[in-house]
Amino acid sequence: MALLISGTACHIREVKLSRKPEELIAASPKATVPVIVRPDGDVIEESIEIMRWSLERNDPEGWLEREDRALIEANDGPFKHHLDRYKYPERHASDPLAHRAAGSALLGTLEARLAAQDNLCGDRRGITDAAIFPFVRQFAEVDRGWFDAQPLPRLQAWLRGHLASILFVTAMVRLDPWRPGDAPLEFPAA
């Protein structure tokens, strides 16, 4: 979403993580997604760093002015830890309900923030919203009925708004997994 807001064009490759292409491993030995290889050859391997890099180049909506690093770190650390164990308990030999309860604590923090404003750092969306929203989306999708039944009306409305946004719909292009020899795909599509 930050790439779209910043007007940063790139070639996009969909990767099936169970069959990581050698090109991904060569660019980023960590071989996780997303990865961006900048025009100068430098590699950025973290979503938030890709967002910051693109917005530092061009930030027409002032997203970087609405950044709460502590909230993003809480999301990327403790919340993601609990999300992974709630969503994939078989991978972690964990109790999904215990991790759902722990993850819900951050949801309450987000709900409280949204009581006073439309987005997490003000009335307009910013980098904090874009960084956290995909994780809230994943958390909600594990058990949509449970999530929708929680007393989180502002968070639920915030999530619905981001899911319905043209920005999100444009960002979530569905692609076939990339294979060596495939023609480059421009993002955003021309």
Predicted regions and their residues:
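GST-like domain detector, emphasizing the conserved glutathione-binding G-site
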Residues: 1-105, 111, 115-118
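Short helix-capping/linker segments at secondary-structure and domain boundaries
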Residues: 7-9, 58, 139-147
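Short, flexible loop/turn segments with low-complexity composition
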Residues: 61-70, 169-179
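Residues lining hydrophobic/aromatic ligand-binding pockets adjacent to catalytic sites
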Residues: 93-99, 118-121, 145-150, 163
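Surface-exposed helix-capping loop/turn segments at secondary-structure junctions
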Residues: 112-123, 167-171
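GST superfamily/GST-like fold recognition
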Residues: 120-145, 162
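C-terminal end-helix/capping segment
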Residues: 151-168
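Acidic/histidine-enriched, glycine/proline-rich intrinsically disordered or flexible terminal extensions
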Residues: 175-190
